[in-house]
């Protein structure tokens, strides 16, 4: 029996202690009983909870309120405080202040009857009967307010003395003595929560998804806060949420109603469920880690910082469906054609139970089989049970599931295990459900009707629990009169006579003592075990664990023990692969266990090695998240298997399997320990059957049954018998169990010593402080870090071994074991004496073990080493020397699957055993595949040292020795990755020496230390030029300081020096320019110093002679760009000349010695002009279009105001007085630009170019004013991700045969540069219309947007500025890193979504190529169309070089030859100063800058063009790969330095033929020429150039192809780019190719793509024929004929007939040889037909000349007649846009056959941009001119075409053609 109420309290307003403005305090007026009960202390702070919103006086008479507050005491017992609050008139106001009264202040005195103070009647109980308490308090209030003639003292005394029965379904009728009759109904089960209707109400308030989120939040220990305007609703919501957790119990702060004064509790770090009134919601919204539920608004707010774990599928979906069926039954029939009249919901009480039943089923499924994972540690005196979490998660298949992991680690689940773990206790509904009904739940999930039926069955039981007696007795409780609280004169609540109440309570208690106690005896039973744990998802058993694989493991073990070495070697690799499966690992432990039982544990050395390898392989995958079963099963085996090393010295297996992190995972040891203890306890009670000394332990079971009894079954029996045993017997049992646990603890301490103390104590890999960071897994980091940290602490003085050299190892092991012993022994109830004795034993065990291991270690080193593969010496290149001899390593796969067998098939070439070599040129691995079945193949992976981009130390799993090894991962810019694990024999010192040597050769002190100069010659000394003293003193000093500052990473001195040379404006602009000096380590002062007169080593005359021989000048002569002449000998026709003013590199350090400038410019003015450009890179001509006469110019970006400001300020006075230096520079620059512009225009006129004349289609008035500046660049990221369309202006520009042929020549050039491809809307903006009407400029200046933003240039200057944005260097570097990660990922990605193509797309590489090619194509098109181009982007040596060189390649066929491409690279890249050394990090000072593949991007762009136009290039793709490889290899001197000036300084610019001793390294071009002469290795057999306009490749991202250079690999000999230089007899992979004799030997050979060089193994037909001819000539002793002479003979014989101007060429390749291999888009016409005029009929067909595939229209035109019926009429019409109303010219075709009016961007366009169906045309009528129409157009030229959908507005060229169009269309409509 229990008291119904513990305390009754009256709490009122405290007038004496005001809390603050507008707020008061409450105080306890009376409490009953006055003394605390012994078992229940009086709750503190009850006055705060009576008024949670604060104590306030009121002006209104308010209704009485009731709510229940829950308080939790220090023992976690809950007290339910029911509060009934009413307001009574306040008579005495002397103690109050005006501020305390609610409402506004009013004038005059407040009448006493107008103020009301709250008073609360509180009932405190440990029982949860809210409705009974509401009735009792209501009754007391009724007696008071209605002045009933009943003593309040007797009511209170009866209430405090009333006793009610405990749970069990019994009823109790009672009365307080005021004419009431009340019934208390106790629930059937104490453990089941009582909810009434609160759960249904919560779902009604918040909805299914929100409640599920709150449910998951509470289970995963998040903070949950409710707020509502109702206190009772807060109580109900908290009660509901807590009840949904059943069978778990909430063990954190639970405060359904939180008072205002305690709001700071919300900031506590612990999880909670709290409710607050809505008036405080503004205060709680600032909480960052609290999930807030608004009960009144029906919403929940989950902060961003909280990752809310959700239920695992399929349970989440099933729960949602079940809840939906119950709460919204009408949803299922909502779509029925004939829905039922109404779908009845269950009444709220039953609905409440149905919802709870759903959650009960959910927990039954979630915890299915939990009892099979309980570990019994102790039975007596109290059961100690542990839950095997990892086993449960592993068997459920939810190891990775966040939700269940958090639930199992929570305090609620710990309580669940301790409460429900014991096998003999009272059972409830959940126990039955989880044991017997889970299978039924799973089966019924797919049948909603059966599921609902089961839910309702469970709901009935839950309902019956709360309402066990359906026929309840009549209840009567008087209620106050209606409106009684509004009475004017109500006396205050009377003071209760305390003595009388106390007396009555004592009398009632005395009566109850005599009554018999109606206590309910708890019925205990054996808890059913239930089904075993199964996976939550029904997964099909994978083939991985098939019977064949298990058989392989068994056979391998049999072969090992039978000493069948050959069979073992064959099966071992397959067995090791099979051990990745759990079943195979289990099979291994079972088989080894059998051999131990057969006393076959002594092994010879070979057997020992095999067994160790298999054990290591098995342990390799035992992570901390697995169930540890395998590692636990191997644990005793490691101490069983051993080999004899010497008499009395044996080596056990545990010494060789210590390198696995699982041995330092304390959770593993605990779990394994508990399992072992459980088995021992089970054995203890099973063996007791035959023990005569302990008769009470005998089991009354047949002999056959006791083996089947589990530990839990035995425990249940023991717990049942426990109360019947005598005290001595009980004590004996407790001692037996404790000794069992103690002995296991000693045993485990020994096992842990075995596995934690290393064989060589100087190499402790697991417990050394430096190790854990590399190998530990996340779950055991706490343990390992604490061990590692503890090494540094004071040593354990008890051990006595602190002064030995191994003391750190010994102490770290002792601490680890001591921590383990403390935890498991304390949990298992071992006495402190036993624990202390264990602590004393451990140091001795460790010390003895270390001593034993010293002998083992000594003897093991004397063993003959295991036969390892012989180290193969690598083949070296001429002049290459080995620096570091081979270090024995294991080459691991680099993340690509090709060489690993696996899913792609093929041999498993990797991992491979071999050696890592370092030579003066390469880092090189050579070895053989570890897989014996692959054969005797040699695996070679190498790359040049200079190409290394990243080198890092790694720790990796050595797959051969199955152990963790130190390793090295080296990445190369040649897209190779060497990832090796060092063998045990390689010491760390040797590895460090290797790395130091590697770094020494990676960043040599000077270029003469590189391999390019290492072919046996002496290092030439660098003789710095001597300068005149007067010029030298300050400059030399300054430069020295600046270089020193640059090394120290500071730029201050260089900037100060600049300040002295230039104005502050210029310097500040340079330094603060966005991106300036962020990524580039280029010194500000290095290339920007003012030119000085410098005297170089060579005399000026000899320098001039050598400069004239350079590629630059030869190309100027080829292009006819003027001659070298003084000012006096200028020839009139020349408007440009070649100046030698930079021959000593005094004008610009990064420019070539000879420059092309306007004839009118004096050399003396050039230095001042140069100052206006970054690094003095002034604008110079670099190429001329031989067809149009247009020029391409390049320069660095502008300084200061830039070119725009200069043009603008020509006629305006200077606003600010500047220095004479800037003034003169600005003036000279203005003159220079004016001369440049004049020369460009006149030059083009002299060339006879008609491109600047206005075309007839554009014969409109010029528009005065300024250019519209819409040529802007969008954000690189956003533009890259926009879909690129083939429509609109872009398509028209791209697909026209000549840009000039289209009237829309320069529409939207800027938009194209910005990456914006407009769709086929007829007019995108009015600015396009304006652009159309402007005449073409003579010069287009492509500059940075930031420099040209304010460009408003007068039209008279005849030039236009095109602002362009481009990718910065840091973006290029980042993209390259991502590209490398995609192509050589280093590890095979575990995430199936991270595919190669996705990674390639994420790298942003292709959008960057797209941007470069797009810019180059536009430049090329502008040049073709008669306008010159000046490119001045960034410093002028990165993107500028990419664009100018690519534009020249597209426009000039010469550069597409081998000799021409060399000229292009030498001129644009080498002479014009691309920073090769810096961008490729070749120099020592660019070490930290990162690799920027600017030149590689250019080569990739050339590769893209080559793909689309394979017949236009003399060289093949191998040539580009060769350059890509060697520009970073340092094999050649060509790409070593950053400018011609530096090359001249180092003496490598000119080959000094006179000095025989000073060899200056090898030039790549000479090497290429020799190779090209010797063989067609670089020749493109499809080469068949057509002398027409520039190439126009398709630059859409979708058209770009992945370059196979990034992914190809040749493991047989390494990259072929080094060996191809040598004669074929030196090829390392040609050795096996020589066939002996002409016998009938098979010529068949297996070709593996990742192993063999396919081009050599399977050459194309022509290469094969050439090699056959060479062999035949050799056999006939003839002098071999040069291959190109032979090729010319063949091609001459197959020449086709001469072509006429109108004939079409059908094949781009040579007929009979390659024409079939050329795709259709590569077959181009030799000469294009003349361009059509306006309104002309077309009578000839054209094939597209670009890289775009044939459109459907073109295919259609090939097969249909071209008579008037097909294209009856065509010509240009202006069409008005539907949306933006702009006029645009389009090429219209009237097609009678198809009854269509089609329109194109131009007459040559093959892609139809749209059509008008003539069937929809209603009329065609003349129209008047409208706004924005083309000027100078006749009013009669307009007509409208009205269709059923819209009206089209057209404008013809004149009235006559408009009438002609109307007639044609009208006749077409009439004919139809």
Curated annotation (Swiss-Prot):
One GO term (biological process): autophagy
Sequence ranges assigned to domain cDENN in this UniProt record: 191-324
Keyword vocabulary terms for this entry: Autophagy, Cell projection, Cytoplasm, Endosome, Guanine-nucleotide releasing factor, Membrane, Phosphoprotein
CDD domains with a match to the protein in the record: PH-GRAM_MTMR13, PH_Sbf1_hMTMR5
Keyword Cytoplasm: yes
Region (Disordered) location: 1697-1720
Gene Ontology MF, one: identical protein binding
The family this protein is said to belong to: Belongs to the protein-tyrosine phosphatase family. Non-receptor class myotubularin subfamily.
PANTHER family hit by this protein: MYOTUBULARIN-RELATED, MYOTUBULARIN-RELATED PROTEIN 13
Entry protein name: Myotubularin-related protein 13
Lineage of the species this protein comes from: Eukaryota, Metazoa, Chordata, Craniata, Vertebrata
Gene: Sbf2
């Amino acid at each position: 029996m229990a008291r119904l109420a513990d305390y009754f309290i009256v709490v009122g307003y405290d007038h004496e202690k005001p809390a603050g403005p507008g707020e008061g305090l409450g105080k306890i007026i009376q409490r009953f009983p006055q003394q605390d009960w012994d078992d229940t202390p009086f709750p503190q702070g009850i006055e705060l909870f009576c008024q949670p919103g604060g104590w306030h006086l009121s002006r209104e008479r308010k209704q009485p309120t009731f709510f229940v507050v829950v308080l939790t005491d220090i023992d976690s017992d809950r007290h339910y405080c029911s509060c009934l609050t009413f307001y009574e008139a306040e008579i005495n106001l002397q103690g109050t202040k005006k501020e305390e009264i609610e409402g506004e202040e009013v004038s005059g005195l407040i009448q006493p009857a107008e103020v009301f103070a709250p008073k609360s009647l509180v009932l405190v109980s440990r029982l949860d009967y809210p409705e009974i308490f509401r009735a009792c308090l209501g009754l007391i209030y009724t007696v008071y307010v209605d002045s009933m003639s009943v003593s309040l003292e007797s009511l209170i005394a009866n209430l405090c003395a009333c006793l009610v029965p405990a749970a069990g379904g019994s009823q109790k009728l009672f009365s307080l003595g005021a004419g009431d009759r009340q019934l208390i109904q106790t629930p059937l089960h104490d453990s089941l929560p009582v909810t009434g209707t609160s759960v249904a109400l919560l779902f009604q308030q918040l909805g299914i998804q929100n409640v599920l989120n709150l449910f998951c939040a509470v289970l995963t220990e998040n903070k949950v806060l409710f707020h509502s305007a109702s206190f009772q609703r807060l109580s109900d919501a908290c009660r509901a949420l807590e009840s949904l957790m059943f069978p778990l119990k909430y063990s954190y702060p639970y405060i359904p109603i939180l008072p205002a004064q305690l709001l700071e509790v919300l900031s506590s770090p612990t999880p909670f469920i709290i409710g607050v009134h809505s008036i405080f919601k503004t205060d709680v919204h600032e909480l960052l880690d609290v999930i807030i539920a608004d009960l009144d608004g029906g919403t929940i707010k989950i902060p961003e910082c909280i990752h809310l774990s959700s239920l695992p599928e399929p349970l989440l979906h099933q729960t949602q469906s079940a809840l939906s069926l119950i709460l919204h039954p009408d949803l299922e029939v909502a779509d029925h054609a004939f829905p039922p009249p109404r779908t009845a919901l269950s009444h709220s009480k039953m609905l409440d139970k149905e919802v709870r039943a759903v959650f009960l089923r959910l927990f039954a499924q979630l915890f299915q089989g939990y009892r099979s994972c309980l570990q019994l540690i102790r039975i007596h005196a109290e059961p100690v049970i542990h839950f095997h979490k990892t086993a449960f998660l592993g068997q459920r298949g939810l190891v990775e599931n966040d939700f269940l992991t958090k639930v199992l680690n929570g305090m609620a689940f710990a309580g669940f295990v301790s409460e429900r773990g014991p096998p003999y206790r009272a059972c409830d509904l959940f126990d039955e459900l989880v044991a017997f009904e889970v299978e039924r739940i799973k089966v019924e999930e797919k049948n909603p009707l059966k599921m609902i039926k089961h839910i309702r069955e469970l709901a009935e039981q839950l309902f019956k629990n709360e309402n066990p007696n359906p026929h309840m007795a009549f209840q009567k409780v008087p209620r106050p009169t209606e409106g009684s609280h509004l009475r004017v004169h109500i006396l205050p609540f009377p003071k209760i006579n305390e003595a009388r109440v106390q007396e009555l309570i004592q009398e009632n208690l005395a009566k109850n003592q005599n009554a018999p106690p109606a206590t309910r005896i708890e019925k205990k039973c054996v808890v059913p075990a239930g089904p075993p744990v199964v996976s939550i998802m029904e997964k099909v058993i994978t083939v991985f664990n098939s019977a064949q694989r298990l058989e392989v493991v068994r056979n391998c073990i049999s072969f090992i023990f039978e000493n069948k070495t050959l069979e073992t070697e064959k099966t071992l690799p397959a067995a090791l692969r099979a051990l990745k499966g759990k079943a195979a690992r289990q099979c291994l432990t079972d088989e080894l266990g059998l051999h131990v039982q057969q006393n076959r544990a002594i092994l010879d050395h070979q057997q020992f090695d095999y067994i160790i390898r298999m054990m290591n392989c098995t342990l390799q995958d035992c992570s901390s998240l697995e169930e540890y079963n395998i590692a636990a099963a191997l644990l005793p085996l490691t101490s069983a298997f051993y080999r004899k090393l010497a008499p009395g010295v044996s080596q056990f297996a545990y010494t060789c399997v210590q390198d696995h992190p699982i041995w330092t995972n304390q959770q593993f040891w605990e779990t394994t320990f508990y399992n072992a203890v459980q088995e021992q306890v089970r054995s203890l009670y099973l063996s007791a059957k035959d023990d005569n000394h302990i008769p009470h332990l005998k089991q009354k079971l047949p002999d056959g049954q006791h083996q089947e009894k589990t530990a839990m079954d035995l425990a249940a029996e023991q717990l049942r018998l426990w109360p019947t045993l005598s005290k001595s017997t009980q004590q004996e049992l407790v001692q037996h169990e404790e000794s069992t646990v103690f002995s296991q603890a000693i045993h485990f301490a020994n096992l842990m010593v075995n596995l934690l103390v290393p064989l060589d104590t100087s190499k402790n890999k697991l417990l050394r402080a430096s190790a854990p960071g590399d190998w530990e897994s996340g779950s055991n980091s706490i343990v390992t870090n604490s061990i590692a940290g503890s090494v540094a602490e004071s040593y354990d003085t008890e051990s006595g071994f602190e002064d030995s050299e191994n003391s750190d190892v010994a102490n770290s092991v002792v601490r680890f074991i001591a921590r383990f012993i403390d935890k498991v022994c304390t949990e298992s109830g071992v006495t402190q004496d036993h624990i202390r004795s264990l602590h004393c034993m451990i140091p001795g065990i460790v010390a003895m073990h270390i001593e034993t291991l010293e002998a083992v270690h000594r003897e093991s080193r004397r063993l003959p080493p295991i036969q390892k593969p012989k180290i193969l010496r690598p083949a070296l290149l001429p002049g290459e020397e080995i620096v570091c001899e081979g270090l024995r390593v294991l080459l691991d796969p680099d993340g690509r699957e090709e060489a690993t067998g696996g899913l792609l098939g093929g041999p498993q070439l990797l991992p491979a055993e071999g050696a890592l070599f370092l030579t003066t040129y390469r880092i090189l691995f050579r070895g053989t595949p570890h897989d014996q079945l692959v054969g005797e193949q040699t695996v070679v992976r190498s790359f040049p040292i200079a190409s290394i981009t990243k080198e890092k130390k790694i720790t990796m799993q050595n797959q051969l020795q199955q152990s963790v090894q130190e390793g090295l991962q080296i990445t190369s810019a040649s897209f190779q990755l060497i990832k090796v694990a060092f063998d045990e024999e390689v010491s760390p010192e040797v590895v460090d020496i290797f790395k130091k040597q590697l770094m020494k050769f990676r960043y040599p002190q000077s270029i003469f230390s590189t391999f390019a100069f290492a072919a046996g010659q002496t290092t030439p000394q660098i003789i710095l030029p001597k300068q005149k003293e007067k010029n030298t003193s300050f400059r030399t000093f300054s430069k020295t300081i600046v270089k020193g500052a640059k090394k120290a990473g500071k730029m201050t001195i260089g900037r100060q020096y600049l300040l002295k040379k230039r104005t502050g404006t210029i310097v500040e602009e340079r330094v603060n320019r966005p991106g300036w000096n962020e990524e580039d380590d280029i010194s500000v002062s290095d290339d920007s110093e003012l030119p000085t007169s410098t005297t170089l080593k060579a005399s000026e005359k000899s320098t001039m002679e050598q400069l004239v021989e350079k590629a630059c000048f030869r190309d100027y002569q080829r292009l006819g760009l003027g001659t070298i002449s003084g000012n006096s000998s200028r020839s009139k026709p020349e408007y440009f000349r070649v100046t030698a003013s930079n021959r000593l590199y005094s004008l610009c350090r990064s420019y070539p010695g000879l420059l092309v400038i306007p004839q009118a410019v004096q050399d003396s003015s050039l230095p001042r002009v140069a100052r206006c450009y970054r690094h003095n890179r002034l604008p110079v001509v670099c190429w001329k279009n031989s067809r149009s006469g247009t020029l391409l110019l390049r320069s660095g970006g502008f300084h200061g105001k830039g070119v725009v400001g200069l043009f603008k300020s020509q006629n305006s006075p200077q606003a600010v007085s500047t220095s004479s230096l800037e003034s003169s520079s600005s003036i000279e620059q203005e003159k220079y630009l004016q001369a440049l512009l004049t020369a460009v225009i006149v030059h083009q006129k002299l060339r006879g170019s008609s491109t600047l004349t206005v075309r007839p289609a554009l014969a409109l008035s010029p528009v005065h004013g300024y250019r519209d500046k819409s040529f802007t660049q969008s954000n690189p990221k956003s533009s890259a991700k926009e879909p690129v369309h083939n429509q609109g202006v872009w398509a028209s520009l791209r697909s026209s045969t000549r840009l000039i042929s289209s009237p829309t020549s320069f529409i939207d050039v800027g938009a194209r540069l910005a990456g914006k491809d407009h769709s086929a809307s007829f007019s995108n903006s009015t600015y396009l219309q304006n652009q159309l009407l402007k005449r073409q400029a003579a010069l287009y200046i492509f500059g940075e947007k930031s420099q040209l933003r304010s460009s408003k240039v007068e039209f008279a200057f005849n030039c236009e500025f095109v602002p362009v944005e481009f990718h910065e260097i840091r973006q290029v570097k980042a993209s390259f890193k991502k590209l490398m990660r995609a192509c050589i990922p280093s590890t095979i990605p575990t995430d199936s979504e991270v595919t190669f193509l996705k990674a390639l797309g994420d790298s942003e590489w292709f959008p960057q190529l797209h941007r470069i090619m797009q810019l180059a194509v536009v430049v090329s098109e502008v040049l073709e169309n008669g306008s010159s181009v000046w490119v001045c982007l960034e410093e002028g040596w990165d993107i500028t070089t990419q664009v100018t060189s690519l534009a020249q390649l597209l426009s000039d066929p010469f550069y597409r030859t081998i000799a021409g491409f060399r000229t292009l690279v030498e001129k644009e890249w080498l002479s014009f100063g691309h920073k090769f050394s810096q961008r490729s990090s070749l120099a020592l000072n660019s070490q930290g800058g990162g690799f920027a593949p600017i030149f590689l991007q250019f080569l990739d762009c050339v590769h893209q063009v080559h793909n689309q136009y394979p017949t236009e290039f003399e060289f093949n793709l191998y040539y580009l790969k060769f350059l890509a490889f060697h520009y970073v290899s340092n094999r050649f001197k060509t790409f070593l330095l950053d400018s011609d000036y530096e090359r001249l300084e180092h003496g490598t610019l000119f080959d000094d033929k006179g000095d025989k001793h000073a060899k200056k390294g090898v030039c790549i071009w000479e090497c290429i020429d020799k190779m090209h002469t010797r063989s067609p290795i670089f020749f493109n057999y499809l080469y068949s150039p057509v002398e027409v306009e520039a190439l126009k490749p398709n630059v859409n991202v979708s058209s770009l192809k992945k370059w196979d250079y990034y992914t190809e690999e040749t493991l047989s000999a390494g990259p072929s780019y080094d060996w191809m230089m040598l004669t074929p007899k030196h090829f390392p992979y040609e050795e096996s190719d020589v066939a002996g004799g002409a016998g009938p030997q098979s010529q068949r050979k297996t070709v593996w793509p990742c192993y063999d060089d396919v081009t050599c193994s399977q050459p194309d037909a022509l290469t094969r024929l050439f090699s056959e001819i060479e062999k035949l000539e050799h056999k006939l002793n003839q002098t071999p004929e040069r291959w190109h002479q032979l090729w010319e003979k063949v091609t001459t014989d197959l020449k086709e007939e001469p072509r006429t101007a109108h004939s079409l060429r059908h094949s781009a390749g040579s007929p009979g040889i390659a024409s079939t291999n050329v795709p259709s888009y590569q077959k181009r016409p030799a000469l294009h037909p003349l361009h059509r005029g306006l309104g002309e009929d077309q009578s000839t067909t054209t094939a597209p000349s670009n890289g775009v595939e044939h459109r459907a229209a073109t295919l259609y035109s090939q097969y249909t007649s071209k008579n008037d019926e097909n294209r009856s009429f065509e010509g240009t019409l202006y069409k008005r846009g539907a949306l933006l109303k702009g006029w645009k010219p389009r090429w219209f075709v009237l097609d009678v056959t198809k009854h269509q009016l089609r329109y194109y961007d131009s007459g040559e366009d093959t892609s139809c941009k749209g059509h008008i169906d003539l069937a929809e045309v209603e009329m065609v009528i003349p129209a008047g001119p409208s706004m924005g129409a083309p000027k100078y157009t006749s009013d009669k030229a307009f007509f409208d075409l009205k269709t059923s959908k819209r009206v089209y507005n057209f404008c013809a060229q004149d009235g006559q053609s408009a009438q002609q169009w109307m007639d044609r269309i009208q006749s077409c409509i009439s004919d139809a």
